[in-house]
A protein has these predicted regions:
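Cell-envelope and extracellular/periplasmic
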Residues: 1-259
Length: 259
């Protein structure tokens, strides 16, 4: 493998819908040379062509992990491959992707326990690329998180402040922009009126995410899971088609931002 052009380094961070609960066998194949995963935990001396499940084995005890109770992985298929494929298709910009996600995590937990691990993964990727004379054009974060804050009835103001505080740590590590993927619904189709009431908590977070991107130029609302209620496989997660469509939409917006 030889990379001769400058790359864009992207951290894919958040909770379970960033880690992905789809079906890898249904995900698209990435275009040859379009993107590579830097596995900061499990394979820090190499770049691996992007494929699903993205982030496999990128689990750190006492840090970002996505294990099942018996030690298997919860990562089963994400938005990343579709995103990178579209991003590369637009202008031919190669992506180096870094996994930094953990299911069921709130912004408060991220501030206390996980942002340091995520930033360390970004720093490791930067060092690897520098050591291998691979130039970096831009550093971005794709952030998909918020369901747990909705469950906890976090207010819009606190959610926006926590998210800004977290992304400031990425900014200090060199990130130039955050592309936010808005959360979807609590799947009230499975839970009737109680589910609709619970989904109002998620609407608070969706509104906070819209406001944050409107008010702060460091953030762009790049895609949303909100339209994909009928593609939900359980109370919180989606079939692969939804991850692919959200990833494609996000990749397109990201490249338009660069234009």
């Amino acid at each position: 493998m030889e990379i001769t052009s400058a790359v864009d380094l992207i951290v894919f961070a958040g909770q379970s819908n960033m880690a992905g609960r789809g079906d890898a066998e249904d995900a698209p194949e990435c275009l040859p040379g379009a993107g590579y995963e830097y596995k900061a935990v499990s394979a820090p001396e190499d770049l691996i062509p992007i494929q699903e499940p993205f982030g496999l084995h990128e689990d750190r005890a006492n840090g970002l992990s996505d294990w099942t109770e018996d030690g298997g992985t919860k990562r089963s298929g994400s938005m990343v491959t579709a995103l990178v494929k579209e991003y590369y298709r637009q202008r031919g910009h190669v992506v180096i992707g870094v996994s930094a996600s953990k299911g069921g995590t709130s912004t408060e937990q991220w501030k206390k326990s996980y942002i340091s691990d995520a930033v360390s993964r970004l720093e490791s990727a930067k060092c690897y690329l520098s050591d291998h004379q691979i130039a970096v054009r831009d550093i971005y974060v794709v952030w998909c998180q918020g369901e747990t804050d909705g469950d906890h009835q976090v207010t819009k103001e606190i959610y926006k402040k926590n998210t800004q505080d977290l992304m400031e740590q990425f900014k200090k590590a060199g990130a130039s922009h955050v592309f936010l993927v808005q959360i979807g619904h609590f799947n009230y189709l499975l839970h009737g009126e109680k589910g609709k009431a619970w989904d109002k908590r998620y609407e608070v977070i969706r509104q906070a995410q819209k406001e944050l991107c409107r008010e702060n130029g460091f953030f762009t609302l790049a895609a949303s899971f909100e339209p994909y209620l009928t593609l939900m496989r359980d109370s919180y997660h989606y079939f692969q088609q939804a991850y692919d469509e959200v990833g494609t939409a996000c990749g397109k917006i990201m490249e338009e931002y660069k234009a």
